[in-house]
Every structure is written in C-alpha cells, then in structure tokens.
Amino acid sequence: MPYSSQQNGYTSASTSRLSEQTSSHSRSSREDRHLTEKGRRPPSPEARHRSDRDYDRRRSTEYVRDDDYRRSSRSSHDSRYADAYDHWRSARSAYSPTPRDDRRDEARNDLSSTKRHRSPEHSTSRLRHRSPESAHRRQNGTANRLDSKPDRGGDRKTGEALDSGRSRWSQRAYEYDDWRNERPSARYERYRHDREPHRSRREDEYETKRSRDDSNGNSIYAPTRRSRSRSRSRSRSRDRYRSRDHSRERRRERSRDRSNGTYSSRDDRRPKADRSAHTIKRDEHSTRLNGTSEDSKDLRHESQRRVSASVQSASEGPASTPVARAVYIKHAEVDQEAPAPPTTRDYHSCPQRWPDQADSAVRASSAPNGSATAPSRSDRPPANGSSGRHSPRSLPTREKAEEARTSSTRRPSSQTNDNVNNSRDPLTQRKATSERSFGHVLLPHELPVECRGKNYMATATYKEGVKSIYKSAADKHLVDVDTRDPRRLGKKSSRYRESLHSASFRWDSNSRGKKPLPPPRNLVLTNLSGLLQPHQILLHILPHGRIESSKLEIDPKIGQSLGIFRVTFAHDFDEHGKPLESMPAGQNPQHGAKVAKAACLALNGRMIGQTRAQAFLDRDGEVIAERIKAKLAENEHKLRPTIVPPAPPAAASSSPATPSTTKQSMPPPQVPRGPKVFMPAAPSPSYASSPASARANTDRYEYSATSHSRYRSSYEESRKLASSETYHRRRGTEEYDTYNRSKPYADAQVPAGSRSETRKDIKRPDEEILNELRDKKRPYVHIPRPKNCDIDVTSVEAQLRSTAPIWVREGQKGFYAAFHTSKEANQCKVVNETLTIGGYTLQVDVRSAPSQHAPSQQIRTPSGKHASVPLSMPAPPKQERKAIDTGLRPPTADEKLKVDWSAAELQDAVFRMLQKELADTFVRDVKSRVVGPYLTAYLKPDGEGGKMLAKATMKKPVIPTSINDHGTTLFEATGEARLPSFRKLAGAHPKKKASDADTTTSQAKRDQTDAKKKRGHTHRSKVHRDRDVSSSENESDDMERGMVVAARRNSYTRSKSSTKRRGAAAWLLEASDAEAGTDDVDSTETDALSRSVSASVEPTGEEQIEVDVGAKAKKIPKVKAATVSKKKGTTAARKKLDVAPPEAVVEADQGSETATPETDVPIKTAAAKAKVKPAKTSAKAKSALVDPFEAGLVEDSEDCHYLRLALEHLSRTGELASEHTLPDEIELEVEAEEQAMAAGGIPKHSTGSARTEGYYRIPPEQKAMHLPDRNKATEDVDTSSNAQILQSARNNRADSRRLVLGIEQHKRETATDTDIFKFNQLRTRKKQLKFAKSPIHDWGLYAMELIPAGDMVIEYVGEVVRQQVADEREKQYERQGNFSTYLFRVDDDLVVDATHKGNIARLMNHCCTPNCNAKILTLNGEKRIVLFAKTAIRAGEELTYDYKFQSSADDEDAIPCLCGSPGCRRFL
C-alpha cells in the first residue's frame, strides 16, 4: 500500500461485496479531488450520453455517497493518483471496460455536491478508438476545461451525426483519462471487447469544432449514426444480452482467479505487441515484482528510453506550455492544502506526456528493479506529495517534520513548466522511487467502518482469527521521532578497570588450600521490642522459608527479652549441592543460605511490632554474641548510678565487698523476691538493705525536696517504730547529736566536702568511745571497718539516718552508733542489717552497754525474737573463737510478697543467698571431713571415748551423764555441728541385783531413765526438724550420706570372724541372763539396741539382719526376759540376732544419717560379762568369773567365730564341742545364705566379690534402708502416742467403707463450693512442688513451701478411659514388663490413666498415714481428681496419700508397704 494512502486517507471508502479485496482505484473509495477545483467536470456533451432517466440525480445522499453494496470488478491495486492530471496512459489507444452492471459508473464531482451521476444508457459499441490526432487530445487546454461549466441539458446531436458511419475517436479518453487510467490493468486486458473505440469530448470547444467540420464537410471524424448509436454510452455493455446466470459464474471465476493471484494470457485478446507495449501492474507475479524476468528487464530499458524522449518532446512543445503551466499552478494551490514530507516526490517529478509527444512515448518505470513492465498509474506519486509504495522511507525526525511543514505552507513560484521540468533530473527521480512493500497491510478501505476516513492504519500484519489493532498514522511519526540509531550514540564515559575480575570456582576435592566456610544461614533480628513473643516474630519470618530452629535471647539477670531473635533456616543440600536423601517426599529442597539472604534483605528495616527491626546474617554465632554483649552493656549502663563515689575503694581489702549499683538516700527498699529457698523463717521481721553506691557521698542533709517528698511516708513509718524519747532529745554537752528534729535540713547549704573533711579529722581511740558508752550506759551498734578503705562518718550517718542514732563516732576498728535503749539498737539492726558504702558491705553488730567490771568484754544482742529483751543482765565471758558470720537471714513474709525490685536489689539478694549457701556447705564440709573422723576415732573401742563408754556401761551408771556433758562440750567446741544422739546409751543401766533393795533402786532409776529418754527424744526431734527445714539443697543429704559411706567403708575391713565374734558375745550375754533367771526387760532392750546400733554401723553381716525390720516392726513384740530351755536356746538367740525392736531400728537409721560412729563397746562389755557356767549359778559367782576377752582367750575374729560355734553347740546339746561334733563350714555358709534369703536380704556372693557376681536385682526395701531422704512426714511422729494411730486406722476404715459404697456418694459429701473455689484458685496460683528420690518407692513428690491443712495441692491429670479399657491396659502394661502403672479410679465407669499422659501428681507415693487425701470435683460437667492437704505440710516434706488397695497379707500378690509410718499396715 502506498504511503500516500496512509498519509492523507480518503473521505469516503467502500468495500466489495465479493470475497476479493476492493481495488484502491475504485471511484467509490477515492476522495473527491474536484472539490477543491473551481468547477466540476462537465457531463458528456453527446446526446448519446444523455438520458431522461438519470437515476443518480434522484437518488438520496446516503445512496450516492455509499455504494458499498454495489459490485466492483476492479482488482486490488495499492494506490490511486487522483490528483495527477497530467498522467497519460500511453501513446496508443486505451480501452476502458464496461462496468458489471448495465450502467456506467461516472463519478462527477461538484463543489457543492458529491453525488455520483450515472447514465442508464447502454453501450452499443464494442470498441471506442481514441483519436490519434493531437488536436483531439489536450490542445484546448486544461484550464478551459476546468473553468467550463457542465452542460447538463445541452442539445443533442442530430440524427445525421448519430447515423454517420465514420467512427470517431472520443476526446474524453484524452481529456479525462485520469480517472479512466486508474482502472486496474486486468480490466483493460480481460474486457477489451467491451471497451468503446470511440471516445468523445464533452467540452464546448470540441463540440463547436466538430459542428464546424460537419458543416464544411471536411471532418473525417464525424461518426455515422450506426457508430454513434453503437458507442452511445460507455456504461452500456454487451453483457446485458447474456444470461445472468452465466455472468455470475464468470464473475465468481474471475474473482477466484484474482484472489488466487492467477493470470491467464488467453484472457488478453490484444496483439502481443500491444500487450508488451502497455505496462500492466501485477502484484501477484513475483517475477515482475522482483524484476527477474527477461520481459521486465527489456521493458525497463525501453521505458527509460521513452522517458528521455518524452522529456525532450515536452521541452520542445510550445503549445503545451500555457496549458501545463495552468495545470501546475492549479495543482500548486492544491498542494498548499495537502502538505507532503520533503523526502517524497511530488507530481512535478513525474515524466509527463505533452500534446506534441509521440504516441509511442511512455513514461519511465517507477520500479528500479523492473517490477512494473510498463509505466502505470501507480508509479506516479500521489497528489498530496507522498511517496510511492516501494519508495524507501527514511526515519522521520523532528528536523524532517519541521521541513515538511515549512514546504507545505510555502507558495510555489510562478516558474514555467520548462524550469520545473529542467530542475529535476529523470534519472534522479527514478532512483528516488522505491519498491513497494505494503501488500500485507490492510488498505484504508479495508479498515473497519469506524476507522475509515480518520487516517488510521493497522499496527501489525493481518492474520485471520486475530484481532488487529489500529491507530492513527500521525501517532506513528511521534513514536518514530524518538527512535535513534544505537551505533551513533556516544560512548559511555566509564573508567577502565585496573585489574581483571577474579574467577571463582566451587571448592571440591581437587581444590587446594583450606575449605571455605559455608555461607551463613542464620538470621539475627535485633532492635525488637521486649514485649514481642517468639510466635509473633515468626509470623514475619515463616513466609520466607522453612525454619530449623529459633531462639529469643533473654537477659540472664532480670529474665526479660533482649529484643534479639535468632533463626536458623533448614538446608536440604549436601556439600556437593545435591538434595539430601532423607528429605521427605513431595517437599521441595530449600537452600538455607539463599533463603536467609533473601529474608535478611526483606526484613531489614521492616516494622515488627512497634520498632523497626535490623537483620544480620550470622555464620557461627559471632554476630549474635556481639549483639548480646552490646545489649547487656547498654542495659547495665542504664542502671549504672549517676553519682560517683567520693573515693574509690582500695585494691586489697580483707572485708567481703559487694559491687553496688544504686542506693537511695532514704530507708532501703525491701529485698526482691529471688529464687525460692526453703529456710526456717526468722523469729522477727527484718528488712534488708539494698546495695547502693549512690549514698556513699550523699550527706544526710543533702537531698532535694523531691527525694524527701518521695520517701517521706517510709521515713515517717520508720520513725514511728522508734521510741518516743527520740523525738524529744536535745544535744548534750558531751554528745554530738547528729540529728535534730526541729531543724532536719538546717545545714543543707553547707558544702558536703567541708563537712566530710571536718568529720574525717575526728577519730578517737576505741577505749575512749567505749568508756563514754559505759558511763552513759548506752547500747550501741558497732560497724567494723574494712582495712584500706576510705569510708567517712558522713556516709555511715547517711545510712543510719532512718533509725536516728544519738551520735556516730569513728574509732580505730570501726564505727560506733549510740542509742538510748536496746530497742532502738535492735531496730537499727532490723532496718540496716548490712550497710553497703562505696562498694563495701559492712556488718551491723548490736551490742549492749559495756560492763563496769570488764570493759573489754561485750556480748552480741540477738536480732531474733529475743531482741526486745532488755540488756541489763551482766554479759557472760566471751569465748575467744572465730564464728562463721554470714550476715544474712532468710527473706521474711513481706519480702517474699515483693515483686517490684531493681537490678541492684536483685544482685544484692542473690549475693547474700549464695553467701548463705556457701556458709552452710562449708559447715557441712567441716562436719563431715573434720569433726566426723575425729569423733569416729575418739569413740573407737580402744580409744578414750570407747573405754569411757564401756566403763560407764559395766560399772558406773553415772558416767554416761558425764559423757553426755562431755559430748555437749564437744558440741559447743565445734560450733553449730550436731553430734549423734546417745540417749539410748545414756539410758542403759547395770543389771538388777538379786536383792529387793537393788530391785527397788533399779526400778526408780528405770523410771528416771524413761523420763530422760522422753525428754531426749523430744529434744532430738526438735533439733532434727530445725535441721531438716534449714537445709535448702539436696547436697546436705548427699554430704551426710557420703560421710556415712566413708565410715562404713572403714568398717568393711573387719573380717567375718570379728563380726561373728560380736554376735557370739551378745548371744552369750543373753544366754547368761536367761540362765540366771533375770526378768529385766530394760536390760534386754538395751542389749538389743546395742546390737542394732552395731548392725547399722557395720553392714558386713548385720546389714542383712535389718532387711525386714522396717516392714515388720509393727508385728514384732517386745522381747521378754524369761528362762529359756536348752532346747530352744539357739532358736531364741537367732531370733534376737535377726530381729531388733522397731525403736532400735529407727534409732539406727537416724544414727546412720548423722554419721554415727561404731559403738561396739557396749557389746564387748556385755560379752565380757558372759560366762559359760551352769544355768543355776548365783550372781556373786558370775561376777567373779574371768572375761575371755580380757584374759586373752579371744584375740581375733577367728577365735570369736569358733567360740560362738562352741557355745551354740553347748547350748543345743549340753556337751562340749569337739572336732567331730562341730558342723562343717560349708553347711554353715549355706544355712546363713538361706536365712538371708528368707529375711529378704542380699545373698552371699558365691565368688567372694560383688564385682564378679554380675548383675542381680536388689529389693526396693533393701534400697530404702540406705536412702538418706527418710520420709520427713513420719520422722517426728511420737511413737509413744497411740491416739493418732488409732485415729488413722479409723479413718482408713471409714475411707474403705466409702469406697465400697461408691465414690460418687463420697464426692457429693465432700465436694462443696469451697472446694471448687479452691480449685479455681489453684489454676491461678499453683503450689510449689518438686519430685525427688523417695525412700518409699522410686520417685516421690515433695512440697517446697508450707501448705496449710485443707488447701488444694495438685490435680491428678491423665487420660480418662472406661473401666474395660483400663483393665486391658493394665494387662498390656504387665505383658510389657511395666509394673509401675498409674491408674486412678474416678467412679464405677471411668478411670484416669496417667501412665503415658499426666503430670507430676502421679509420683505421689502411698502411705498408711498420709498427709493428703483425694476428692472428686465436678466442674462444667467434667469430673476432676483433686488432692487436698489433710494436715499441715511443711517445706521439704513428702506428699503421700492412701492408695486404698483392697488386699491383705494373705494374698499371694500382696505388695509390701515401705512407708515406715507408725500406723503402717505392712501391705498396700
């Protein structure tokens, strides 16, 4: 499609009704080029061209303007040159085909009307030949033709002229051939037989000349009537004589041929010479388009020669100059309205045919490549100055567009046609003509209806089924203006690199050097809010990838979030970059480093919560460590005091110093509630001072009104605690009163430096200060001063300001603060237990007034519950010993309730608690390592203590009292160490005499001993309780247990003979007492106690005897002294050796817990009294016998063993033993092993060593005997009281009856609203419990705080299943070997199974006298098992409840009970 068609468009367009494309040369699609002319084309002057029936003049405007429904047989040529009036077809005759319909299309344009007029007359002539004369061509001039008015109703020719036989050449073919020549060439070739050979002109001049020639008879052109009738109208065709069906078929065929691009030479009826002379444009033939055919080359050279000839003839023709000038001037005016770009050629550059030009002159071909074999209408440039279809279009630029606008508005000069033609070179014009390449773009008349006449064009190649996009052609120029040639762009001014890029390769096995670290896949987020939870932060991180681990960093001091979050992303690739095989199926592998990098870029600077987070990548934890360190330093800096101490402390100091942080100038706040440590409560309330260096240089007068108003209330409360005398005292002459009630801030303007310097110079000797206190009888507080420290009196006064001392003096050893009464001094101790000044912790020691007799002796006033006792009594002489003074005390109830405290207070509290624990550990270490071995060595039988005990047991009944006194002295000498209790040994007394007086004396002594024993038991229980409660760590029990083990290991070296010797001696003692007929019960109990104590110390042989003592203590009756026959003597002796009374066993266990040394002196003493003699020997004779041990008869363990065997044989048979009568050693060992197995003990090792025996099971009861954590709930129970035992038994029976009647009824009786209320309270505040090893069975549950009676302890949680399911689970557990099941029955149908799912409540053990009971509560329709405290439970006491198993001792599967309580039922 030529560029001109896109450039100017058409005012009206039409489409064909047929399938082929409509020609661009259709008269219905051309613009009205004559609208710009002064006149319109006149109608045909011939009468044969006129008709009374001209339907075009009577048609409506719509029909005239748009004839889209009409058929057109014109081919689809690409351009139409409507404005080129001087475009001549060729020198030879041209043929115009008749239109398809019976009427000829004649577009006659008018200035005021665009109607198309049609002539209904039929053409009767087959051919109309053009006139070969020049006078019939354009010699009359185009201007006259344009200026002439149309002759609408002119007179027609006479019949003579019409009937003339001469054929006449029609001048219309020459005057108005522009619209005819634009018809497609195919029409001229195919319908040559329909063309009229005679064309007539319509100008008046031509008609006048013809009439003149006719009148003169000289005209040879006058046509005959036949020819005139034959060529009456061009619009008439012989096709109307054909059948319509045949015409339609031919139309379809021609349309099909044109659409397929086929052409047949047989349709052309012209001679071969005429066909080659007349150029035909055919876009369908590629050979002609490309100019490769021989005919195209020949025609191209011929056309060039004809162009030169035509140009030469045009320049020589004088008659054509005025006409051409007029035509060019007229078209110049038209060009002013239609601008054209300068790159395109206008109509002046086209070769013209002038009237005097030869007929064979043909214009040059427009295609340089010879695509057109002959000049055609499409080769001329359009009237608007646009270039041809194949012309090379240069890129439109702004300069060219400006030049186009300038040339379009410039008036053409009035130069002659010669100058115009001479100014343009035909060869240059030919070169400027480019080949056409727009056949693939839709033509304007093929555009949609809404896009026609608007200068629109398609933006892409037309494709069937694809919607095309149309835009204005003017926009294309705007887009192309910005297009630039990238080759002409300037080079970038970039700097050259100084070095080459370093190549990076993936490290593999062939690489050298150290393997590089993997890329980081840890992401660290900082600057987060401390209130954000981890799940809130993960919401921002999870969208980036899968997370392997995450952690929110916590401040170790205060337990608050640091605002630092660490995330590790999952990595699913190995070292070689391959996905891991362990990755789940269907999961996409993730590269942790890439995900971490993307997350870091996305999260850095994002708002998370209320802050903007900062993201960092961390490879091995270095980044997060630095961030945590910086954050902790920042937090510490915020809490750092702003007031600097006056003088830094010295480097070396003998006093314990605590680094302080902050301290207010008023009474110190309470100690924060730190980790719970269960220590006995202090007898009196006390307040701890918080470490603060702020008051180091703060004078008591130098604090602002703001601080005064802040602490005024606390200050007044502390003042009210003091005596009323403080408010009315005045300054004395000899006293320096440091506080004046009337003027508390009178000296506020005095500089602190001057006052401190003044006070610093006042330093008195300690004797002078003490003499002053002695004279005034003032109790005082002594504050020792550390060495090499610079603490002045002003700082101490500021610390003691809340308690208002009379004066504060500085001595050589410390500071002294005087008070009026001891109550004020004790109050100062309560408020200020320790003082923290300048980083030093100073202890406050309350002392009474110095004594008049002993000025140097002073006594410490206790700060406990006896602190309010007046200190008027004389002070006892002070013992010179170094006591461990921790300076700490357990937190009070008020301190426990405090929750708001600063970091400095927390630091001080933690330091004091650690100091307390270290002091306790040190005391226990001294007991176990220093005192314990010393006592063990002292109480050995061959040592001093052992001999004293032996003498006291045999001869002197009063000596044990002195031994106890000596033991008391030892207890005082070793500080707070608690020695083993020897009350049982002290209660032992000699055998009864045979006389009545001795019997009476013995009875009186026995009563007195019983009373002492009860008092001693009560005292020991109290000591035991204090000791158990004060222990806050399990290490204390571990240390004591280690001490006991050490003592036992020392005793393991004793041989079996020595062990059996002691047993034989005891048996001899019992046998002699039985034969003598004694009936002393206490003596027998004492001997049994001696054996039990020895057994508890040496586990070699006697440990096996104690196995079942705890389990059968309730069923064993007391051993009564009676005369035993010889037949039953051995059996009785063995029973006494195997079984000891329960009281003795309990005492033995307690003794082993407190590192009781070996005490076999009483056994030796008893054995010494044993004598082998007849049964009826008098008491006097017995006392005269020689002791075999003292006589040297028994020297070692072997002698003792054989002596025992001999005595057993003698008692059994009544005969002396000999070699033949003694039993075999193997038989004795087997018998002893059987006895041990029957007693439940550990059997004897067959190999002689436990290491070579392998693994064997130790019964739980055997383990329980050696556990240090004895049940604290039963240790302090008084064995003498049977009321509680009976009450417990009644309760157990009542509980059993309730269980039989139904737990549901029991629930309704006990579950009240109060219980539900307590259960709701437990949800908010749970009891502090812990689990640890229990002597009853495996693990146990212990209380960590005091639980009052009736409070809810814990809920029993587990899976709620039906009874049938619980039975099956129990069997399944037994098959799996799991005998520790946790099934708790709720009612008759439901059971709670806590075996796999539950809480620590399942660890509660059974006890026959429990301290908890279970209740079933119904909350929201759901049954809950809740455990309540039955009695008050102390801290450290084990929680137990009754399992209520319905079994007895007769059952085979009865489970023995190991609770060890006085009311134990022996079986569960």
UniProtKB/Swiss-Prot annotation:
Q: Which organism is it from?
A: Mycosarcoma maydis
Composition bias, Low complexity: 12-26, 406-416, 650-662, 680-694
Q: What is this protein called?
A: Histone-lysine N-methyltransferase, H3 lysine-4 specific
Documented EC number(s)? 2.1.1.354
Transmembrane region(s): none
Q: Which InterPro entries match?
A: COMPASS_Set1_N-SET, Post-SET_dom, Set1-like, SET_assoc, SET_dom, SET_dom_sf
- Per UniProt, S-adenosyl-L-methionine binds at Y1443
Annotated region (Disordered) at 1-439, 636-737, 848-884, 986-1103, 1141-1162
Pinpoint the Post-SET domain residues.
1453-1468
Q: Where is the composition biased (Polar residues)?
A: 1-11, 306-315, 366-376, 417-426, 849-861, 1086-1097
GO terms (BP aspect) = methylation
KW Nucleus (keyword) present: yes
Q: Where in the cell is it found?
A: Nucleus; Chromosome
